[in-house]
Amino acid sequence: VTVYDAEGTKVQLDGSIRLVM
């Protein structure tokens, strides 16, 4: 499952956070 916050950051439930280009 992947969740995107309001700032467009890709937050995965495995704890990794990635910036959405």
Swiss-Prot record:
The keyword Membrane applies. GO terms for cellular component: cell outer membrane; pore complex. GO terms for molecular function: porin activity. Keywords: Cell outer membrane, Disulfide bond, Ion transport, Membrane, Porin, Transmembrane, Transmembrane beta strand, Transport. Disulfide bonds: none annotated. The keyword Disulfide bond applies. It is found in: Cell outer membrane. It comes from the Bacteria. Its main location: membrane. GO terms for biological process: monoatomic ion transport. Disulfide bond interactions within and between MOMP molecules and other components form high molecular-weight oligomers. Structural rigidity of the outer membrane of elementary bodies and porin forming, permitting diffusion of solutes through the intracellular reticulate body membrane. This is Major outer membrane protein.
